[in-house]
């Protein structure tokens, strides 16, 4: 799959933009602050249904009242149009010109993998950031996972509301706990199953790219189990603690994902370079997983890759990503090695040429 055409209206510093893209490796270059990352952001918005770096109201171009993003996606010879329109009155998504009830109905129509310079700091920060990264990836590849996640979040919201009540809600909590256990067990199973596959891919890739010295393990740390009856019993045991804290404290919404190299936790002992390398391997493994398991190659978006790695590492990474993606976007401040790209786009003040 690849982005055939992108159209923007009042998005960030783009007043109006219409650009066609080719498959393959695309260089987007220009000075800092001209709109390179904004272009990447717009494409990835249609992958995850929101910005990866700001709230919707901050994306509207100064002086405008709304923004629009539209894209034509080519996949196996078929064309699909996706879009989003946002104003202070609300937001809605479109597929082939038809309004959708929610973003979940179009999630997966454009699969994508993103890497930005800020991601290692964010990813290795709070556990919620790592859960979010894993959930966004799995939701793209499995409709069942997405539905279980949606149902789990709805039940969790109801349970948290009950835990804040002053009257006796024990019977109601038990009913919600059983539903949490049911959906939670499926979420945990899918996360563990996926990470087992990703671990093999990560180590195969590292053997060739040599980013990190030794065996790498992405380890899933769960507060429960992957069996709904066991989770239900755990939730019953922890009810008093949850009632005291007035929030749900156990389940996949509190689980974590840690990276180890030769048994050492990268979050604690890893250098910034090692964290960057581990996260890139994780991202690359996602592209491989999508291509092999789901049968659809994602669009890859690499923001400011040139400032992060030397030429040898860059070329190796680009080659691997291109092997498992039909389209790779790379942003840079300088037009380096132009002959190596299928398309080159220059950006200045929100204008492309």
UniProtKB/Swiss-Prot annotation:
ATP binds at residues 30-37. The keyword DNA-binding applies. GO terms for biological process: DNA replication; DNA synthesis involved in DNA repair; double-strand break repair; SOS response. Keywords: ATP-binding, Cytoplasm, DNA damage, DNA repair, DNA replication, DNA-binding, Nucleotide-binding, SOS response. GO terms for molecular function: ATP binding; single-stranded DNA binding. It is found in: Cytoplasm. One of its GO terms (cellular component) is cytoplasm. HAMAP family: RecF (MF_00365). The RecF protein is involved in DNA metabolism; it is required for DNA replication and normal SOS inducibility. RecF binds preferentially to single-stranded, linear DNA. It also seems to bind ATP. Belongs to the RecF family. This is DNA replication and repair protein RecF.
């Amino acid at each position: 799959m690849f982005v055939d055409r992108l159209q923007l209206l009042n998005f960030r510093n783009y007043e109006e933009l219409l650009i066609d893209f080719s498959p393959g490796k695309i260089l987007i270059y220009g000075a800092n602050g001209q709109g390179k990352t904004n272009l990447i952001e717009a494409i990835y918005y249609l992958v995850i249904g929101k910005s990866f770096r700001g709230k919707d109201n901050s994306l509207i171009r100064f002086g405008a009242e709304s923004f629009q993003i539209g894209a034509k996606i080519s996949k196996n010879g078929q064309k699909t149009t996706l879009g989003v329109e946002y104003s202070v009155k609300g937001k809605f998504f479109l597929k082939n010109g038809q309004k959708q009830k929610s973003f979940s109905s179009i999630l997966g129509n454009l699969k994508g993998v993103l890497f930005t310079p800020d991601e290692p700091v964010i990813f290795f920060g709070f556990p919620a950031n790592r859960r979010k990264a894993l959930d966004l990836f799995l939701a793209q590849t499995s409709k069942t996972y997405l539905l279980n996640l949606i149902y789990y979040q709805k039940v969790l919201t109801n349970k948290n509301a009950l835990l804040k009540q002053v009257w006796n809600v024990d019977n109601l909590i038990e009913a919600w706990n059983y539903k949490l256990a049911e959906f939670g067990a499926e979420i945990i199973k899918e996360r563990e199953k996926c990470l087992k596959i990703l671990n093999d891919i990560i180590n195969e890739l590292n053997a060739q790219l040599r980013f990190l010295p030794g065996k790498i393990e992405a380890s899933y740390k769960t507060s429960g189990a992957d069996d709904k009856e066991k989770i239900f019993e755990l939730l019953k045991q922890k009810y008093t603690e949850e009632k005291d804290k007035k929030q749900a404290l156990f389940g996949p919404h509190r689980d974590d994902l840690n990276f180890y190299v030769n048994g050492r936790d990268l979050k604690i002992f890893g250098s910034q370079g090692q964290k960057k390398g581990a996260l890139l391997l994780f991202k690359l493994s996602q592209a491989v997983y999508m291509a092999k398991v789901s049968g659809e190659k994602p669009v890859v978006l690499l923001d400011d890759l040139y400032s992060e790695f030397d030429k040898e590492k860059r070329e190796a990474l680009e080659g691997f990503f291109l092997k498992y993606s039909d389209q790779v976007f790379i942003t840079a401040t300088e037009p380096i090695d132009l002959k190596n790209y299928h398309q080159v786009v220059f950006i200045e003040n929100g204008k492309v040429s």
